């Protein structure tokens, strides 16, 4: 049920590495958001670095916008190492894994949003997320490249999702009460406009 989405990826090699990372960890849904190179998943460098995950490149889908790509998702996690003045609720990756596992047990679809290589997620992308998440890293140098971040998330998420099966636990049937991502984005934009109007937030 997990989805890996890459907004505005400019490097075919990173797309190939992403496909390899998520397939290695048992995931199979790669969504590419408005890539700078149309057909980026079919580029030679992407195919080379995907190694045995070429099938994920072949089944990956390109979307014109992040909004379009997450319409079927109930939980949208935006990965970023930067603090933001405004945006969705923030949590660390450990807490996010718990939430993802619960959503998965409830048959919800989850989107993991990774930003472009040079700039990371923009505020517009984060406004469409239900949660903002950071990975615990060296405070003086917290920047992972795209493929590294995806592999860390995919590996640790796989560990979390397998915990119940290893321990023989029954799935928790309690439903996670999550707001619609589009509704969250509209609410955050309404708040932002209000804060600008009263001079609290500098546009």
What is the predicted role of each segment?
Residues 14, 125-173:
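Structured adenosyl-cofactor binding patch, chiefly the S-adenosyl-L-methionine
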Residues 7, 33-34, 80, 133-140:
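Short beta->alpha connector loops at strand-helix junctions that form conserved
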Residues 15-26:
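Histidine-anchored nucleotide/phosphate-binding helix
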Residues 28-36:
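Short internal beta-strands
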Residues 1-6:
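Short, small-residue-biased leader/transition segments that mark boundaries at the very start
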Residues 42-119, 163:
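S-adenosyl-L-methionine/SAH cofactor-binding core of RNA-modifying enzymes
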Residues 167-203:
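An accessory alpha-helical subdomain
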């Amino acid at each position: 049920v997990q989805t890996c989405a890459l907004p505005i990826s400019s490097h075919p090699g990173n797309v190939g590495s992403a496909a390899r990372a998520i397939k290695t960890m048992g995931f199979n849904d790669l969504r590419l958001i408005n890539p700078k190179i149309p057909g980026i998943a079919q580029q030679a460098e992407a195919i080379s670095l995907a190694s045995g995950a070429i099938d994920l490149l072949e089944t990956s889908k390109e979307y014109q916008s992040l909004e379009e790509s997450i319409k079927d998702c109930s939980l949208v996690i935006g990965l970023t190492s930067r603090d933001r003045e405004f945006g969705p609720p923030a949590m660390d990756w450990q807490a996010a894994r718990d939430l993802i596992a619960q959503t998965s047990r409830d048959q919800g679809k989850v989107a993991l949003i990774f930003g472009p290589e040079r700039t990371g997620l923009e505020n517009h992308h984060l406004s469409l997320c239900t949660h903002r998440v950071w990975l615990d890293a060296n405070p003086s140098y917290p920047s992972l490249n795209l493929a590294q971040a995806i592999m860390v998330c995919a590996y640790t998420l796989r560990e979390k999702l397998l915990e119940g099966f290893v321990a023989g636990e029954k799935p928790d049937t309690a439903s996670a009460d999550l707001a619609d991502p589009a509704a969250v984005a509209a609410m955050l934009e309404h708040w932002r406009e209000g804060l600008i109007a009263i001079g609290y937030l500098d546009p």
